[in-house]
């Protein structure tokens, strides 16, 4: 990652995986970057995992925590898939943040992670001193997220890694093949029969649990607008401007109506996955926002 984006480093980064129990018999896993008290907490999008932030973490070069949301990555699943909403996620994330990053300067969330950040600020406002929301608002709907849901609703398993990679390339035209290959190796695993499967829980109908897609219809995240409007923590919205973005002008207008103090940055070269398309630039935005 560092070589691809020209990030200088003298030695391999210090990264370790840990987990804590958030409910009896259920654990949430996370990556701890660097030494010392974490300054940032990162929450990924639906169908992703903590490694989506690897390049951003390298560019920041500061102690931080990147969490695998429930039902994603190496975190345990939940028995009831309806219990993976942003509000449910926020309760689990609060356990982790209190335990390992209680003094984090900024919580950064992308897509599902962004909605979870909004919910976290309402659930545990003392943990969210500043919030960076990456390409999502409570105004997301099925039309805005169609390109993403089309990808997520694809096959659950693939006969070979090459076929999985080919589908991923088809739906992520802004990313390099090598970056997508690395991402898949963190977000999929090989079954005993040699086929490959995504490392996240899926709805029976083919959507991704807790993300912007359900088996039958799009969740209504509009109530999160009220939570966002009531919170007083400084907010930065990073909006991708390419076609896969799920934020439109009406969403930005609604954000500014409810939070006139919010900061909005438009990233021309990024789609929905700003951390994948322009990770170094995103890291700089986060660093600058934390210093305000």
Predicted regions and their residues:
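Alpha/beta-hydrolase fold catalytic core
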Residues: 1-38, 61-62, 101-103, 263, ...
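Helix-rich cap/lid subdomain of alpha/beta-hydrolase
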Residues: 139-203, 216
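Catalytic histidine-centered segment of alpha/beta-hydrolase-like enzymes
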Residues: 270-279
């Amino acid at each position: 990652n560092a070589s691809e984006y020209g990030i200088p480093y003298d030695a391999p980064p210090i990264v370790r995986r840990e987990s804590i129990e958030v409910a009896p018999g259920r654990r949430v896993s996370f990556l701890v970057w660097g030494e010392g008290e974490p300054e940032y907490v990162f929450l990924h999008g639906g169908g992703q995992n903590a490694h989506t932030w690897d390049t951003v973490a390298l560019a920041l070069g500061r102690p931080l925590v990147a969490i695998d949301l429930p039902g994603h990555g190496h975190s345990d699943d939940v028995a009831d898939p309806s219990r993976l909403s942003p509000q449910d996620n926020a309760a689990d994330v609060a356990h982790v943040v209190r335990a390992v990053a209680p003094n984090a300067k900024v919580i950064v969330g992308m897509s599902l992670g962004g909605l979870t950040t909004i919910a976290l600020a309402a659930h545990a406002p003392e943990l969210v001193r500043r919030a960076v929301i990456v390409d999502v608002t409570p105004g997301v709907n099925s039309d805005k997220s169609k390109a993403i849901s089309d990808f997520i609703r694809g096959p659950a398993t693939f006969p070979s890694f090459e076929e999985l990679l080919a589908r991923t390339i088809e739906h992520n035209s802004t990313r390099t093949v090598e970056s997508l290959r690395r991402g898949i190796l963190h977000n999929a695993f090989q079954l005993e029969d040699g086929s490959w499967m995504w490392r996240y829980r899926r709805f029976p109908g083919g959507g991704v649990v807790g993300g912007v897609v359900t088996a039958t219809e799009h969740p209504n995240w509009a109530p999160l607008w009220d939570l966002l409007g009531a919170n007083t923590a400084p907010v930065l919205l990073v909006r991708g401007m390419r076609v896969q973005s799920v934020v439109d002008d009406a969403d930005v207008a609604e954000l500014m109506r409810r939070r006139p103090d919010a900061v909005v940055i438009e990233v021309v070269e990024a789609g929905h996955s700003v951390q994948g398309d322009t990770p170094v630039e995103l890291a700089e935005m986060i660093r600058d926002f934390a210093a305000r």
